[in-house]
Amino acid sequence: MHLYLLLGALAVFSLVYDKKENGIVFYFLILVLVFVLISPAFISKNTESAANDLPSHKAKSVRKKLEIEQALDAILNKNTSSLD
């Protein structure tokens, strides 16, 4: 939301500042500059969240133990249900 507000404010500022025919060129120059300055912040924010989403070694071992327990429970339930 703040990004769109910033880009809109810069667009209005650039069009008001330069009232000549090349105002559009100046407008696009400002937008490209803002995009280049802001994009590394978004890229670094996405890589940090991706690193936090990766499961740790402990989480992997806990998940594997849970899967083994579920498989053994399924085998035991199958064997006891066949006796009934």
From Swiss-Prot:
Q: Which InterPro entries match?
A: Ac76_baculovir
- The superkingdom listed in its UniProt entry is Viruses
This protein's name = Uncharacterized 9.4 kDa protein
This chain's source organism reads Orgyia pseudotsugata multicapsid polyhedrosis virus
